[in-house]
């Protein structure tokens, strides 16, 4: 046994030395292909994106009172500062994904080598090797930086050159950011399943709470999902989610973040998730009768240079001038006059507040419902307004008649 242990230690030392040399030589190792070349370029020279770049969030479109009427996004994420993330979540992450996080400098060569030797001797994957820094780099290049599927595959491909570049970027990251900032950025970035990205969206999705209020069991379940959000989905595999949660709780206890008695107590508790995940509808199509105003606002902003892709990648609040009370009166008026189900007819009405400097749109309605299902009397056309203005129609006849008199 002692000889085997000595052999293992020797192998660890040899592998660690080889990895250090490879890491030093990484800049000259080529991956081939345009997408892989771009990933390499990002890893070498675009550290500012990894350390200061924004991540996609949720843009909210509101009425004049600030009440949300639609949400626009590519990834449902709410970026929150460190102080709004439960310490339990950070402790769960470190104890499970990277126990030497506060000791290493972005790349845990000792842990990497030991995991490699363990896996070789075991004939399979027994230990992971990526640090939190490395996982952050990989996820950022995959979720944020990749512009197409090919680049996403290049950012996550299983190859030694890509891994070495990832390690180098992880090391640079550690020199640039404080440890807590790395944890915060990581927890704001990654996917937790159910179309939730970042710890805040995950907390809302599964527990209808905030990231700041996560208890040890909730934090442990969410961190446990990172191993495989599909296989450990608590709605389709609750037993697996419980087992993984309890592993994380025991890791937290073993690392001294919570007492073992506390871990045991939480391990005996049910998952406590919502009956169904709390999601968020996306797009003007979900705004109901406010959809026409939502659509108009997006088209107006596009004319001003703020395109839909930018809005979907931002975390903006777009406050419209729509007044819900006036909107309801206008809606009742057109639908009392023309039924939404009248074939071939759609009556529209805009109410615009006059003014010298601005003319605020207070209501924008159609007798038909906003939507894409014609069988349900829905339409997105004709729009109540146009960016080139509405025709005055018969309104001007009175002026012609007055002139004739």
Predicted regions and their residues:
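Extracytoplasmic low-complexity, Pro/Thr/Ser/Ala/Gly-rich segments
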Residues: 38-78, 276-281, 287-288, 294-303
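Surface-exposed intrinsically disordered loops and tails
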Residues: 149, 273-289, 356-358, 374-376, ...
């Amino acid at each position: 046994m002692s000889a085997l242990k000595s052999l293992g230690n020797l192998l660890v030392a040899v592998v660690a030395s080889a990895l250090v040399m490879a890491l030093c030589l990484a800049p000259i190792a080529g991956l081939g292909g345009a997408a892989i070349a771009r990933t390499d370029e990002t890893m070498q020279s675009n550290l500012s994106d990894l350390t200061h770049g924004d991540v996609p969030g949720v843009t909210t479109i509101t009425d004049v009172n600030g009440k949300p009427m639609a949400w626009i996004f590519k990834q449902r994420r709410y970026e929150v500062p460190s102080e709004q993330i439960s310490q339990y979540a950070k402790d769960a992450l470190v104890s499970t994904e990277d126990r030497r996080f506060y000791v290493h400098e972005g790349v845990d060569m000792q842990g990497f080598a030991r995991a490699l030797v363990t896996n070789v001797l075991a004939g399979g994957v027994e230990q992971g090797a990526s640090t939190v820094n490395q996982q952050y780099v990989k996820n950022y290049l995959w979720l944020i930086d990749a512009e197409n599927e090919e680049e996403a595959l290049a950012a996550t491909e299983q190859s030694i050159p890509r891994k070495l570049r990832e390690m180098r970027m992880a090391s640079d990251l550690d020199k640039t950011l404080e440890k807590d900032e790395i944890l915060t950025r990581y927890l704001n970035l990654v996917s937790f399943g159910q179309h939730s990205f970042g710890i805040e969206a995950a907390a809302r999705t599964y527990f209808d709470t905030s990231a700041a209020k996560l208890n040890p069991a909730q934090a442990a379940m969410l961190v446990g999902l990172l191993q495989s959000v599909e296989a450990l989905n608590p709605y389709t595999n609750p037993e697996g989610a419980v087992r993984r949660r309890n592993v994380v709780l025991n890791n937290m206890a073993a690392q001294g973040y919570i007492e073992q008695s506390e871990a045991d107590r939480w391990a005996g508790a049910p998952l406590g998730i919502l009956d169904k995940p709390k999601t968020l509808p996306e797009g003007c199509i979900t705004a109901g009768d406010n959809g026409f105003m939502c659509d108009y606002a997006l088209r107006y902003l596009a004319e001003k240079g703020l395109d839909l892709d930018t809005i979907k990648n931002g975390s903006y609040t777009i406050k419209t001038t729509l007044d819900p009370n006036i909107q309801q009166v206008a809606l009742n008026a057109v639908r009392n006059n023309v039924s939404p189900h009248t074939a071939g007819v759609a009556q529209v009405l805009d109410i615009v507040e006059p003014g010298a400097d601005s003319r605020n749109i207070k209501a924008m309605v159609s007798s038909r419902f906003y939507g894409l299902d014609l069988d349900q009397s829905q339409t997105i056309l004709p729009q109540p307004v146009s960016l080139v203005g509405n025709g005055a129609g018969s309104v001007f006849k009175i002026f012609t008649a007055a002139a004739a008199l």
